[in-house]
Amino acid sequence: GDLLITRAGPRNRTGVICVVDGEPENLILSDKTVRLSYLRNFVNPHYVMTALSSPAMQYFVVDAMTGMAASQVNISQEKMKTFFLPLPPLNEQQRIVDEVSKIFGRIDKLNF
């Protein structure tokens, strides 16, 4: 359940976050990727992924990007540490994740 965030690359692929469930064998992270470990008793990784992927949080992610060309931008780990993420109680985090998953499930049905 670790979180991975791209911290460098093309503008549209920087700041992308995912949850890695399990422990993949022979995984080596690029220096352009940040791994977030967290306190499992307080944080649902899927909630963090959902929250950081939201349009409101993406505003802060894009604002933290530096670089002259859209083909190569960066977000420093120091900037990432300044992101403010609302952190409701764990049961509320799970409720939000469940609700968002239901909505995405409905969207997937419409697309296929």
Please tell me what each predicted stretch does.
Residues 3-29, 46, 50, 59-65, ...:
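Short, ligand-facing micro-motifs at secondary-structure edges
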Residues 4-5, 19, 35, 84-86, ...:
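Structured core elements
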Residues 4-7, 51, 55, 99-106, ...:
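Generic, well-ordered alpha-helical scaffold segments in large soluble proteins
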Residues 26-34, 43, 68-87:
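A short glycine-rich beta-alpha junction/loop motif
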Residues 42-47, 94:
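Short, conserved charged micro-motifs
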Residues 58, 72, 77, 93-94:
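Glutamine-centric residue-chemistry signal
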Residues 82-112:
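Amphipathic alpha-helical coiled-coil/heptad-repeat segments
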